[in-house]
């Protein structure tokens, strides 16, 4: 009977041949808009053996390491990065970015042609008009194009944005939506079929956060000021759609229900005036009941805050999904969120948090109170950790993403 066993040398050659035949997938986020998400997705894809090239720029807010076993191609905004060394002027850097972005796209297209890449995955769009034409050129070159829709449309849309994004949705070969809500919105506004959109959730940030330490000094300072009080927090960029003012209006109501409560608000003010927010905070509660940190918060400090807070409030007026929800779950923090967009898909009512109506300070206070009734908090904390590891698991998300890659080229 013939012996079909391969020798060690033949096995090595077979493995090398298989690797040489493996597709290279190009993933693009020109501005690193979702740097934490990108790192975790690419890390998970690389761990399952996928060959990934990440086209991006240097992260603008500190250092984020490159995902292991991922080729990073920094082909975007070299001049703007260089200008950042000599000037802090936002208008100057924005002007340079506008000038060089078309050149960056030309370099990217040349790279795709030289490397014979067949699948291109956009995680974010910078210019709906320019990126639409890049997508068309990529497809003419034989590429299949995938786009991840974190939101169906921009949070603060400009005139014509919906039409521009619909053109992109109609043109790409496949769409990855992070929630069912986003999928439904794209289908309703753009006439896209359900088969063209896969729903893959937003995973937790543990793969990235595990590479950083905790700012224990900061955590100690917060805990010293808060004492043994329950810390109710808002984390993340401050923009109109996030409804922070509703949470601030709930301070007094929460104190009435939970006298030993303490409030923490941290994140950069992207829209509005920092001083106006500080004045509103001062009017809404006593200084000794509040900790604020209005800046871009590095990972070490985020981990410090997550280590001390008890409940995360997301009083959003509109939203499609939230990475902060999963980030909180991973550390056992329940989440109170409004029933807008896809947020309700991320919360198990009464188990990992509570869903409330938007614009309702009373509802926030009632939900916070329910978190601490009897032994409810302990159970919710355990459920939150379970959701992070099961429902929002990156290994599973990476497998589903790779399946989409294979599907578009089959």
Q: What positions do the PLM features span?
A:
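Nucleotide-activated donor-binding/catalytic signature segment of Leloir-type glycosyltransferases, i.e.
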Residues: 276-303
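Acidic anion/phosphate-binding donor-loop and adjacent secondary structure
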Residues: 158, 184-188, 195-198, 203-222, ...
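Conserved acidic donor-binding segment of nucleotide-sugar-dependent glycosyltransferases
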Residues: 349-350, 354-361, 370-375
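Acidic donor-binding loop of glycosyltransferase active sites
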Residues: 304-320, 333
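A short, well-ordered alpha-helix in the C-terminal region of glycosyltransferases
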Residues: 376-391, 400-403
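Conserved donor-binding/catalytic core segment of Leloir-type glycosyltransferases
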Residues: 226-242, 248-251, 263-266
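Short N-terminal targeting/anchoring amphipathic segment
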Residues: 27-28, 90-100, 108-129, 314
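Short hydrophobic beta-strand element within catalytic cores of glycosyltransferases
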Residues: 328, 334-337, 347
């Amino acid at each position: 009977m013939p012996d079909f066993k391969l020798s060690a040398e033949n096995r090595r050659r077979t493995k090398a041949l298989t690797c040489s035949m493996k597709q290279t997938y190009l993933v693009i986020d020109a501005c690193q808009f979702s740097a934490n998400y990108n790192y975790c997705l690419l890390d998970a894809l690389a761990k399952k053996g996928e060959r990934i090239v990440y086209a991006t720029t240097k992260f603008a807010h500190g250092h984020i390491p490159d995902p292991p076993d991922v080729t990073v191609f920094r082909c975007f905004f070299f001049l703007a990065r260089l200008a950042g060394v000599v000037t802090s002027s936002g208008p100057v850097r924005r002007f340079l970015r506008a000038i060089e972005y078309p050149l960056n796209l030309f370099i990217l297209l040349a790279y795709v042609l030289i490397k014979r890449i067949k699948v291109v995955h956009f995680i974010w769009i910078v210019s709906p008009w320019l990126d639409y034409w890049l997508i068309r050129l990529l497809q003419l070159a034989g590429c299949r194009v995938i786009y991840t829709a974190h939101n169906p449309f921009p949070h603060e849309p400009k005139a014509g944005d919906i039409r521009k994004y619909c053109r992109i949705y109609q043109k790409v070969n496949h769409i990855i939506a992070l929630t069912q809500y986003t999928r439904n919105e794209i289908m309703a506004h753009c006439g896209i079929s359900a088969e063209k959109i896969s729903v893959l959730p937003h995973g937790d940030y543990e793969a990235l956060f595990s590479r950083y330490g905790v700012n224990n000094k900061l955590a100690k300072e917060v805990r010293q000021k808060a004492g043994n009080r329950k810390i109710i927090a808002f984390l993340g960029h401050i923009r109109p759609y996030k409804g922070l003012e509703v949470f601030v209006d709930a301070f007094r109501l929460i104190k009435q229900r939970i006298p030993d409560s303490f409030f923490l608000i941290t994140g950069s003010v992207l829209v509005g005036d920092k001083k106006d927010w500080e004045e509103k905070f001062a009017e809404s509660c006593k200084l000794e009941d509040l900790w604020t940190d209005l800046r871009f918060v590095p990972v070490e400090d985020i981990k410090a805050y997550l280590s001390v807070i008890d409940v995360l409030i997301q009083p959003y007026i509109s939203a499609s999904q939230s990475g902060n929800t999963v980030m909180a779950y991973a550390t056992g923090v329940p989440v109170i969120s409004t029933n807008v967009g896809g947020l309700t898909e991320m919360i198990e009512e009464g188990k990992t948090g509570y869903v409330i109506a938007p614009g309702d300070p009373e509802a926030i206070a009632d939900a916070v109170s329910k978190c601490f009734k009897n032994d409810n908090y302990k159970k919710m904390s355990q459920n939150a950790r379970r959701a992070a590891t099961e429902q929002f698991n990156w290994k599973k998300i990476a497998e589903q993403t790779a399946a989409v890659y294979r599907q578009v080229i089959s």
